[in-house]
């Protein structure tokens, strides 16, 4: 077991004392960094980059060379599981991910395999092992997966969607087929995340990017229920340490109490939720991650610093806050603005920790 030199992030997730508020950024390996663009060009395309352990490791480490971040997150994609199920993932210029064989009916669902994390998804585990080795205990490594509902939206819609009419048609016209798909995905995600933990991920996060498009009742039945099943099935200790679990539903600020009942350690917040309100509601039960609007990084550094100060003051004194953006960093943000953000979090947060 490599001794962690900086365990602030893991401690904050477990609501333990820290010296300053830890910070990392979602999608922080990405197109806003010139070094990422160079590595992606070397790989040829996005999935080739994900499937090459050495290059995936390189782009995971790039932001850490620029910024004093408190955690690294595996460079991968949420659609690795549907890809491993044989749906034919490809990326259309300007349109994002697409599938050649989307799921259209119950018969399609029944044919889907549950992928072997060390087989079809072995390239992800190789990347986790490579990154852990190269991190040399500097900061913890976060593993992740999409939620069953979010993965299902891409699989049924055939790619990205604005209105989600195809999956909602299945949800209301053939709920049995959708539940079968979500159950299969929950089993797949549980196996996948546990394999990441065994390979070296020290914390895991479930991204429910599209849970917020559901009604409250549908969210409980079609998204949260399956995330709860996953949390129940996860390894919560490895290598002598607790492995914290974070749930993040974009647009899910109205359901924090229900999310906190799943047994997760932390909840991710998007920028539409007031962090002071969130702490009042669930801070006694879970840590909170977030939640600056990613577009704030277009502002001058002084304005970014003001926003960081406001969010820190909103959370207030004490433990259980991991600073992050409310979603992924945008691809055309000036890298020096991201640096100003990270520096401001560390400098301004010390006063909130005794």
UniProtKB/Swiss-Prot annotation:
The record marks 77 as: Transition state stabilizer. Transmembrane segments: none annotated. It is an enzyme of class 4 (lyase). One of its GO terms (cellular component) is cytosol. GO terms for biological process: heme biosynthetic process; protoporphyrinogen IX biosynthetic process from glutamate. Pfam families: URO-D. It catalyses: uroporphyrinogen III + 4 H(+) = coproporphyrinogen III + 4 CO2. Substrate binds at residues 27-31, 46, 77, 154, 209, 327. Keywords: Cytoplasm, Decarboxylase, Lyase, Porphyrin biosynthesis. Its EC number is 4.1.1.37. The keyword Oxidoreductase does not apply. Pathway: Porphyrin-containing compound metabolism; protoporphyrin-IX biosynthesis; coproporphyrinogen-III from 5-aminolevulinate: step 4/4. Disulfide bonds: none annotated. Belongs to the uroporphyrinogen decarboxylase family. Homodimer. HAMAP family: URO_D (MF_00218). This is Uroporphyrinogen decarboxylase. The gene is hemE.
């Amino acid at each position: 077991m490599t001794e962690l030199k900086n365990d602030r992030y893991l401690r904050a997730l477990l609501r333990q004392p820290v010296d300053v508020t830890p910070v990392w950024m979602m999608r922080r390996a990405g197109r806003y960094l010139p070094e990422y663009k160079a590595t992606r060009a070397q790989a040829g395309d996005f999935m080739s980059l994900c499937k090459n352990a050495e290059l995936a490791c390189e782009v995971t480490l790039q932001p850490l060379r620029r910024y004093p971040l408190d955690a690294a997150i595996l460079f991968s994609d949420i659609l690795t599981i549907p890809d491993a199920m044989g749906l034919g993932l490809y990326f259309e210029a300007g349109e994002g991910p697409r599938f050649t064989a989307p799921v259209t009916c119950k018969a399609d669902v029944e044919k889907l395999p549950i992928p072997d994390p060390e087989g079809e998804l072995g390239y992800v585990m190789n990347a986790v092992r490579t990154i852990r080795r190269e991190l040399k205990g500097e900061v913890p490594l976060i593993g992740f997966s999409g939620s069953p509902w979010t993965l299902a939206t891409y699989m049924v819609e055939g790619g990205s969607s604005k209105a989600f009419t195809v999956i909602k048609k299945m949800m209301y016209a053939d709920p049995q087929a959708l539940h079968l798909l979500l159950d299969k995905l929950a089993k797949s995600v549980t196996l996948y995340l546990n394999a990441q933990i065994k390979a070296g991920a020290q914390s895991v996060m479930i991204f429910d990017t599209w849970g917020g498009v559901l009604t409250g009742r549908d969210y409980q039945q079609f998204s949260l229920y399956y995330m709860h099943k996953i949390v129940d099935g996860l390894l919560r200790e490895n290598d002598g340490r607790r492995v914290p679990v974070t749930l993040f539903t974009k647009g899910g600020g109205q359901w924090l109490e229900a999310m906190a009942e799943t047994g997760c350690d932390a909840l991710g917040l998007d920028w539409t939720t007031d962090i002071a309100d969130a702490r009042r509601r669930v801070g006694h039960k879970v840590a909170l991650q977030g939640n600056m609007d990613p577009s704030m990084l277009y502002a001058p550094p002084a304005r970014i610093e003001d926003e960081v100060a406001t969010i820190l003051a909103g959370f207030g004194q004490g433990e259980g806050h991991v600073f992050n953006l409310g979603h992924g960093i945008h691809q055309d943000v000036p890298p020096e603005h991201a640096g100003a953000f990270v520096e401001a979090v560390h400098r301004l947060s010390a006063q909130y920790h005794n």
